[in-house]
Amino acid sequence: MAWDSSNRPGEPEQNQVIAMTSGKGGVGKSTLCVLLGLGDALRGKRVLLIEFDAGLRGLDLMLGIADQVVYDLGDLLEGRCTISKAVMESPLHENLNAIVAPVSLEAPMDLSDVQLLIDGLRGHFDRLILDMPAGLGFSSKIAGCTADIALIAVTPDPVCVRDGAKMAQTLEKQGLCRHRLLINRVEEKMLRRAVLMDLDAVIDGVGSQLLGVFPYAEEIPLRLSRGLQLKGNHPVLRIAQAVSRRLDGEYVPLVFP
């Protein structure tokens, strides 16, 4: 079992730019981005979420800014607006901001333009969280040239675990060998009945060190899809803050659902 023992006291690591990836869609990747962003924000960090899934915008709804968006990532990369025009502050927390994806993809994003943008944003935010499209190609290329670390989001089922392993291998081919695992939608009673894979088997199957485990909580995506706030003491936010601290190099015991 590949427990993450690399983050110990006195060994902080540079994890300012995080790429949230997944081998397949439907694993709750964007929800995890918002939760991790809130976990960072609650710890006093200034956070920027950047959504790359052109044509499938969703963060605007989850962050409660759908009615306020004028400019998006496509506008920014094409030079139609400044960074200050594209960055939107979320009402969920004053430290939480976002640049949302284009509603349609007019032209493929240029990797060099994306890299210049991310490099320019590093000095303005404590954490940049890149919400990548599902799949192996485009996501791994952007992560490889911009991110300090990639998080691989999976659910505990064999298909998702196999695709997560492919994502880990693809990231390494792109030169990003620092990746960690987030297991989402874990339901204890399903684990007991062996309907879902054992968490040890998930970790070994993906081949990435475990960073955090999030429970199956149907109300979370429902609330976030309406831009509704979560209480600061909600269990998933405690998990998100623990993940945030581990990313900062603190030795924090894994928080389980």
How would you name each of these model-derived features?
Residues 224-240:
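C-terminal boundary of histidine-terminating zinc-finger modules
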Residues 23, 155-156, 181-193, 213-220:
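G-domain G4 guanine-recognition motif of GTPases
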Residues 200-229:
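Beta-strand-loop-alpha "switch" segments that mediate conformational coupling across diverse proteins
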Residues 162-176:
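Conserved C-terminal guanine-recognition region of P-loop GTPase G domains, centered on the G4
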Residues 137-158:
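Inter-motif core of Ras-like GTPase G domains
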